[in-house]
């Protein structure tokens, strides 16, 4: 083994951040965020929207229904929770 291989640190990849709308806040310290993804159809060129709901950890329970939030990928916190709340971008009116 060479010295260079022994002393190098394994770097972590960048964590994914997504913006979405809170659709439920009824669980303790958990919010459900709907993420929208837009893709162009390969052949016809039409913009197609797909929605996905993910659970995110909200430690202080500050987010409410209708808020636009920024969530970041994290280690698995439970069976379904793999995101955490970073900030509330816009409060619901």
Swiss-Prot record:
GO biological process: translation
Top-level taxon: Bacteria
Keywords recorded for this protein, A-Z: Ribonucleoprotein, Ribosomal protein, RNA-binding, rRNA-binding
PROSITE patterns according to UniProt: RIBOSOMAL_S17
Matching SUPFAM superfamilies: Nucleic acid-binding proteins
GO molecular function, one term: structural constituent of ribosome
The UniProt record lists the keyword Ribosomal protein: yes
GO cellular component: cytosolic small ribosomal subunit
PANTHER family associated with the record: 40S RIBOSOMAL PROTEIN S11 FAMILY MEMBER, SMALL RIBOSOMAL SUBUNIT PROTEIN US17M
Biological role stated in the UniProt entry: One of the primary rRNA binding proteins, it binds specifically to the 5'-end of 16S ribosomal RNA.
Homology family: Belongs to the universal ribosomal protein uS17 family.
Known partners and oligomeric status: Part of the 30S ribosomal subunit.
HAMAP family named in the record: Ribosomal_uS17_B (MF_01345_B)
Record's protein name: Small ribosomal subunit protein uS17
Organism: Corynebacterium aurimucosum (strain ATCC 700975 / DSM 44827 / CIP 107346 / CN-1)
